[in-house]
Amino acid sequence: MIFVDACFGKETEYTPVWMMRQAGRYLPEYMEVRRKIGNFLDMTRNPEVVAEVTIQPIDILDVDAAILFSDILNLPMEMGLPLRFEKGVGPVFDKTIDTEEDIEALDSSADEKLEYVYKGVKLIRERLPEEKALIGFAGSPWTIATYMVEGRGSKQYAKIKKMVYSNPMMLHRLLAFNTKETIEYLSKQIDAGANAVMVFDSWGGALEKEKFFEFSWNYMKEIAKNIKAKYPHIPVILFSKGVGLYMDEMDGEFDVVGVDWATPIDHALRIFKDNYTLQGNMEPTRLYSKTATKEAVEKIAGIMKGHRHIFNLGHGILPDVPVENAKYFVNLCKELTRRG
């Protein structure tokens, strides 16, 4: 698999490419399925639907890896926090973590309740072309905790950051719980057929540098270490958004570093050299323009020539991007990096 080879820094025919949120609303085929099912959460809990929409970008765009169609909040939902999606707001937990007792009440067998995810993974792997990789994923312990404590997305993260400074021991307890459950969750995705796993730390950048390492990165490292010990042949991808200035202190037993669009990829390359594969990092809104896309792909390909790299966006693809432009991006990445 070209994607797995690139994760491990092996020479490949061209630089593999996929996109975050590639199974999503910009695809008419996805929207058709969503109209039929009606509810996003119900889609994530239906293995047949999960398999269908995960494979759509492979069939339509010919990306080199499929990423499991799911949500990072399915895990805390199965821990016992009822989840709903509110129009104009996004995910909402009406029950939040406010006390030690709330942590005590969380279900420590949440990973066992996610059988619908593992069934989806198994179906996808059975139906995917052999050469295409399947990426399993989870949210980082910190990012999941922000939703569990705040109850929804936030701009200030005041509630959880208050915990950082006034009750760090309680927060560490929650993060340790999330870490244990995430290791189990990712392990079962691998057992079901995932060829790589990725940890998404969407809100790591909400923390100052010292606290980022204490409350986010160290737990992500723990997940990577455990997965690599059990599954050395499985690549582990870590992606923290908004932490470009913290990269100089990042290390650990993982294979790929996701680079967001606000971090120049040459900055990441100077820090990580070829110790890890870099994944990213075109600004997603460039996809509205083929000219802007070409400019960015040429620049990134030039910087990363001869280095460990996987093409991706620096964040998720947006819902109103023309499919034709997404295809153009994928084809261009392959064309400009083809060796020999």
From Swiss-Prot:
Record site: Transition state stabilizer: 71
Binding site for substrate: 21-25, 71, 147, 202, 315
Subcellular location per the Swiss-Prot or TrEMBL entry: Cytoplasm
UniProt EC number: 4.1.1.37
One Pfam entry name: URO-D
InterPro entries: UROD/MetE-like_sf (IPR038071), Uroporphyrinogen_deCO2ase_HemE (IPR006361), Uroporphyrinogen_deCOase (IPR000257)
GO CC term (a single one): cytosol
GO biological process: protoporphyrinogen IX biosynthetic process from glutamate
Record keywords: Cytoplasm, Decarboxylase, Lyase, Porphyrin biosynthesis
Associated pathway: Porphyrin-containing compound metabolism; protoporphyrin-IX biosynthesis; coproporphyrinogen-III from 5-aminolevulinate: step 4/4
UniProt keyword tRNA processing, yes or no: no
Single GO MF descriptor: uroporphyrinogen decarboxylase activity
Signal peptide segment: none
Catalytic reaction(s) noted: uroporphyrinogen III + 4 H(+) = coproporphyrinogen III + 4 CO2
Assembly, per entry: Homodimer.
Role, per record: Catalyzes the decarboxylation of four acetate groups of uroporphyrinogen-III to yield coproporphyrinogen-III.
Similarity section: Belongs to the uroporphyrinogen decarboxylase family.
Name the record gives this protein: Uroporphyrinogen decarboxylase
